Design a protein with these regions (language model features):
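Helix C-cap/helix->beta junction micro-motif
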Residues: 12, 67-68, 189, 223, ...
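Conserved glycine-rich beta-strand-loop-beta hairpin in the small C-terminal domain of fold type I
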Residues: 153, 157, 172-183, 193-206, ...
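Active-site phosphate-binding strand-loop segment of PLP-dependent enzymes
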Residues: 14-91
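PLP-dependent enzyme catalytic core of the Aspartate aminotransferase-like
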Residues: 209, 214, 218-228, 232-268
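Conserved core segment of the aminotransferase class I/II
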Residues: 93-173, 180-184, 263
């Protein structure tokens, strides 16, 4: 799970229930009818696992939310990386407008990390306990937030221009090819992973039953390659590791060759 979801709710004093996300379900958690939740965080394509929900899986979450009077907070920060016939938005699912809020960011789509610009979609028909959620959110924003700076707004507007969309598609295609290169190497090595398509992330199972930090140390010391230990994303990440395609082509190819060499020697 993306750590911000956890930490922000801990600071708010909320009780947190973790959905089961593991190899058995392809790291695409599904609702548990025995669990009652008021707010549900979903991220698809997922950070860190790279898995992306299909329409049937998202429908299961929407049905659960409607049945339990819950609200889904849907993080679609990586929707631009989807290449297969998968939903890019929770609102592609019937009934979602009555139970979901969608958040998206230009951080990964257009390289806005640090510049900070994104958007939130709240259907005007979304209500809970007699309160209109859109009206409440609008009041909150008008009180606590003065908006993104003008230069950043201009840059964000350029993202949606014809030329901006052309450049973004080229940029995303570049990272998608990096992800394919990494995934191809893992296929060659026979290592289980999720992601590698529809996402810039590759979530791999550490070889030889190694722990996440043990594998981190191996790659750092033997290959001079750095990734993210899965344990940093919660207990379901133990024994897994995240690689990213957000690098240049030359470094990606070099890193893959180094990883292949280390893991080939490890299996001897």
């Amino acid at each position: 799970v993306y750590p911000v979801y956890v930490d922000s709710n801990i600071m708010a004093g909320r009780e947190i229930v973790y959905a089961t996300s593991n190899e058995a379900n392809g790291f695409a958690a599904l609702p548990d009818e025995n669990v009652k939740a008021d707010i549900i965080y979903l991220c698809s394509p997922n950070n860190p696992t790279g898995s992306a929900y299909n329409a049937e899986q998202l429908k299961a979450w929407v049905d659960y939310a409607l049945k339990n009077d819950a609200i889904i907070l849907y993080d679609s920060a990586y929707e631009a990386f989807i290449t297969e016939d998968l939903p890019r938005s929770i609102f592609a699912i019937e009934g979602a407008r009555k139970c979901a809020i969608e958040m998206c960011s230009l951080s990964k789509t257009a390289g806005f990390t640090g510049t900070r610009c994104g958007y939130t979609i709240i259907p005007k028909e979304l209500e809970r306990d007699g309160h209109n959620i859109y009206a409440t959110w609008y009041r909150r924003q008008a009180t606590k937030f003065n908006g993104v700076s003008w230069p950043v707004q201009c840059a964000a507007a350029a993202v949606f221009s014809e030329e901006g969309q052309k450049q973004i598609k080229e940029n995303i295609s570049y990272y998608q090819e990096n992800a394919r290169i990494i995934a191809s190497a893992l296929d060659e090595l026979g290592i289980y992973y999720t992601g590698g398509k529809n996402s810039p992330y590759i979530w791999l199972k550490c070889p030889n039953n190694m722990g996440s930090w043990e594998f981190f140390d191996l790659l750092l010391n033997e290959a001079n390659v750095v990734g993210t230990p899965g344990e940093g994303f919660g207990e379901n990440g133990a024994g897994y590791f995240r690689l990213t395609s957000f690098g240049d082509r030359e470094n990606t190819i070099e890193a893959v060759e180094r990883i292949k060499k280390v893991l080939t020697n490890l299996s001897k």
